[in-house]
Amino acid sequence: MMRLSSTLRRFRWAVFATWLLLLVPSIYLALNQSSNLTGGGFEVEGSQSLHVQRQLEEHFPDQGASPLALVAAPRADASYEDMNAAVVHLEKLAAEVPSVKIVPNPQQPAPQPDRPYVITLQLDFNNTGAVDVAKQLRQKVGIHGEEPGESQNGKVKFYVIGQGALGAAATQATKHDIAAAEKWNMPIVLIVLLAVFGSLAAAALPLVLGVCTVVVTMGLVYLLSMFTTMSVFVTSTVSMFGIAVAIDYSLFILMRFREELRAGRDQQDAIDAAMATSGLAVALSGLTVIASVTGIYLINTPVLVSMATGAILAVAVAVLTSTTLTPAVLATFGKAAAKRSSYLHWSRRAEAAQSRFWTRWTGAVMRRPWASAIAAAILLLVLAAPAFNMVLGNSMQRQFDPTHEIRGGVNAAADALGPGALGPIRVLVTFPGEGDASSQAATTTIEAVRQQMTKAPSVVSVQPPVVSDDNDSALLSAVLSVDPEDMAAREAIDWMRAELPGVAGQNATIDVGGPTALIKDFDDRVSATQPLVFVFVALIAFVMLLVSIRSVVLAFKGVLMTVLSVAAAYGSLVVVFQWGWLEQLGFPRISSLDSTIPPLVLAMTFGLSMDYEIFLLTRIRERFLQTNSTRDAVAYGVSTSARTITSAALIMIAVFIGFAFAGMPLVAQLGVACAVAIAVDATVVRLVLVPALMAMFDQWNWWLPRWLDKILPEVDFEKPLPKIEVTDLVIIPDNIAALGPSGSDLRTMVRTAARMKTLAPQTISVADPLAFSGCTRPTTRLSTQRAGRPKAHTPGLHPVTMWRGRLSVAVDALQTEADTEQAPVERRGPVETTNVQLPTGDRLQIPTGAETLRLAGYLIMCRNTTKDFEDFARLVDLMDSHTAALVLASMDRYYCGRDPSNRWVATQLVRRLADPQPSDEHDVRMSGPDAAEDWEKVRQRCLSVAVAMLEEAK
């Protein structure tokens, strides 16, 4: 991965050009991809309903289900003339559309002012183009959004209904839902990213990658839709998962990049290190999501296959953008992405540092692992319990609000022809071999079947049989007294499939189809294959975790915990939609959940949950390989990853909830389930169950049989990253960074550092043992204490505030040196500096603590002002007098004076410090009321240093 990252960095402009070439045509394709999408796709290969549908298309050209119809619905004040004119107008509009013809319907009476009128249409080609035709008709009759068209006087409403119209309306609704969801979730995502990174440039990177992912994926969907059936719901799936996953993946890499910068790596090495760790975890997570979602293909229905394909494409493109574009972007704009804005004060803490809160949290969980694990498991089981009351169903019409024009048109058509006339049950009687459907024996069999059909529940009438054009089969159509989507219609299907084959005997085969049978077969296929999907997805997740973590126990626990997250998501669906607990928030109460949701939620949330599992466990394993301590590894992994996982989860939840509020019921259910699963997984599971169970299993967490270790492919998380040279690098530790400097401190420090670099172009970089002298809670790694000396009690400063003071003294001294022609002392060598890492990500050169003291001493000897003594005393306050004396005793090694004798410079400085006499004649009487006391403190501090210097000279 590091080699790939290095290559992408070097050829970043080629990477940009490649993605630009992909993005430009994808924008055009994405804008037009809805023209090839369908509102159907619920056919089940090998089912009776699909067999009947195909036979109707091939051998019953006049009996095929009409994909479209026009409806004229009169108002109460409409007249015969109004209805006749409306029907003529609709027939004229239909005639203007190519490939459309009007089919007479014997069940439809003449236009009447108190009854809607239905104009049945038929296409000259298969129904694959019905959506495009429906769009043209909707535009011609004046349908706008959810409102129907109407006649010139407004007394007759116009509707377009049928499968094609459902697809056209769903396409329009999906576009509206996506726009509404993005208006809701994009600001929230941006706020979360700004809070995480504290930088607009860093926050913009994941958003740009998310948009790029969605656009390119939409273009690929368009290309696929030219060759295979793609559902209109694929656009919502791509938008939802493309944005969420791309932002999450780039977030993982970018946060690791900033962590590596804080650890002392330069920009290029930090990119490579981030890609070798988080980049590899992203690739494995993406593969896991893709492999999990492929389980949907086992159901093998076009609508689910197309939604799964959209999700797979979105995740694949997200992985590609994150692992190829991110290194290139960081190589070009890494400095801007690493900086934190001084105005975003809430985001000043380093993102990859160990959190004290999460360290304490993990410690508390691991001290009581059994109690923590049992409490978390009980909570998850309580959340999952409502899932036992789940009721599944399917309804395309239910995807629209009751006030939508589609629902209004269907209701009007039901008033005109009866509710069952819109979706009659089709019974196909086939005579195998060289059968003759027109023979006397066949006619007798067909009539017996017809008579038996009249006895089925909810059947109103059975139309006379129609013989196929090849004379091998006959078609019987039964009209029901209920809507085709009513449960009573399904009972009629079951009754016919159970009773009619016995009547036909051995000489004929019976297939029952129609719209109701089509949806019923779909639901039955989903229910029958869902256990297989679960086993497949769980096995895939187990294998991917096993390869990534190389632990049988951790892989098994990961799968088990994800199952609990999915179960909690199922329970939330029942609570929100079936029980209507959140009806006040706009989630409608429904009698049954969409049957497509359980397998989609299972596969997608299983894959997405693996993101956090792999990200957390690889971090824990990385630490375990260094320390060989499970508890330390868990504490480190959770404390360093919790903030990243929480931030990523918040982003995903925001995206999913946005679609839940703005989407059609199917999309809303998917959004709610995924949001709950991610929320539970990122909190209860990853931050409670994971540390608790790992503490319980201890060394068993890493158990892997030798034979399995030999056959598993190597995923080299163990490869050590390049060592960091930090001999002269000073990084603000976390317990100090929390204090936070003001924005003015940061800006002043950066400007002053630039000024110092101009005044002292020749510097030497050295380590700074006084880096944190005077700061609250200095780190033992970078601070030193003289043996036998008590620790000084100094006021707590933020390092940036202290370093800004250093720079101010240095610039003052260097400017004075440049302006003075005959100074009493002259500098012998370059200024000693050290490198500091700011909370913004900037690296600056500042004078060391010792060099700052010497520069302050130089100002006292050359300028000798009150301010010089006050600055000197302030510097000494941040350490102790003895440390200052040790530094200043060696002044003659850095400065030479008029008298070349030994220690002349130090001696002159002692004289000035022992009796401060400022050249500006400091007069305490002209100052404030506390001036005398303050000046006396300055004199005493200077005197203490002078005395200490004399003692050191002895």
Swiss-Prot record:
SUPFAM superfamilies: Multidrug efflux transporter AcrB transmembrane domain. Its main location: membrane. The gene is mmpL11. Disruption phenotype: Mutant has altered cell wall lipid composition, reduced membrane permeability and altered biofilm formation. It accumulates the mycolic acid-containing precursor mycolyl phospholipid (MycPL) and fails to export MMDAG and mycolate ester wax to the bacterial surface. Does not affect trehalose monomycolate (TMM) transport. It is a multi-pass membrane protein. The keyword Ion transport does not apply. The keyword Cell inner membrane applies. GO terms for cellular component: plasma membrane. Keywords: Cell inner membrane, Cell membrane, Cell wall biogenesis/degradation, Lipid transport, Membrane, Transmembrane, Transmembrane helix, Transport. The chain crosses the membrane at residues 11-31, 188-208, 214-234, 235-255, 279-299, 312-334, 373-393, 529-549, 559-579, 597-617, 648-668, 670-690. Contributes to cell wall biosynthesis and biofilm formation. Transports the mycolic acid-containing lipids monomeromycolyl diacylglycerol (MMDAG) and mycolate ester wax (WE) to the bacterial surface. GO terms for biological process: cell wall organization; lipid transport. It is found in: Cell inner membrane. It comes from Mycolicibacterium smegmatis (strain ATCC 700084 / mc(2)155) (Mycobacterium smegmatis). This is Mycolic acid-containing lipids exporter MmpL11.
